[in-house]
């Protein structure tokens, strides 16, 4: 078994050379780069990862049912393994769907990468979050035309990530050099919903809502002939 825990804090004024969806193309105000200082887009404060491989103690050469009977042959060679990952969410920035500061850099031609931010008053965080209302949308307002919003960069946290992947393997020796392996693999074993970032564009009909999630549970089976 292996386990690791990471606590981190990363701060910058630009996390990517090329923008991706939800990331700014340019600073909101090129003459005030200090206002861009905030948590990095990739900053994950806490991450715990545990992995294991365990040979089941049944069958020939094992603690239990080690004779040459039918049960021994059936239960010999089983192995289970898995990876458990728990982490907090990464930060995101609330942005405007339309440019109001007349700087000409508010939104990209592709419709994402908005770098104009709204005004914020009060606490935008919520004590009880849900996919329908991930943060306090009432805390954000449009700034007056011709001015920059006072909301900071990456001031909110997105959903965390909780995932368990596991496998069950049966190895059967066919000869001294040949082995038949059956595999059952489970991705997101408990079908835990891992949500994507909420809609962060003020003015969008779904502003503040989580509208998509990562992959649900997948199960796959396979047979390998190893020689």
What is the predicted function of each stretch?
Residues 1-227:
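Short, solvent-exposed micro-motifs at the edges of structured domains
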């Amino acid at each position: 078994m292996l386990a690791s825990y990471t606590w981190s804090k990363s701060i910058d004024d630009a996390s990517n050379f090329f923008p991706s969806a939800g990331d700014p193309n340019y600073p909101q105000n090129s003459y005030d780069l200090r206002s861009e200082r905030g948590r990095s887009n990739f900053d994950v404060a806490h991450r715990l990862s545990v992995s294991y491989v365990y040979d089941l103690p049944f069958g020939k050469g094992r603690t239990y049912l080690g004779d040459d009977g039918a049960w021994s042959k059936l239960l010999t060679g089983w192995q289970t393994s898995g990876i458990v990952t728990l982490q907090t969410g990464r930060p995101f920035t609330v942005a405007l769907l339309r440019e109001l500061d007349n700087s000409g850099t508010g939104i990209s031609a592709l419709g994402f990468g908005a770098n104009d931010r709204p005004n914020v008053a009060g606490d935008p965080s919520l004590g009880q979050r849900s996919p329908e209302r991930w943060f306090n949308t009432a805390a954000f307002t449009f700034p007056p035309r011709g001015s920059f919003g006072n909301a900071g960069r990456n001031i909110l946290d997105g959903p965390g990530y909780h995932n368990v992947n596991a496998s069950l393997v049966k190895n059967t020796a066919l000869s001294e050099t040949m082995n038949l392996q059956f595999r059952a693999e489970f991705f997101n074993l408990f079908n835990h919903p891992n949500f994507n970032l909420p809609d962060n564009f003020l003015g969008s009909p779904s502003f503040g809502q989580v509208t998509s999630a990562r992959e649900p549970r997948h199960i796959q089976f396979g047979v390998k002939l190893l020689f």
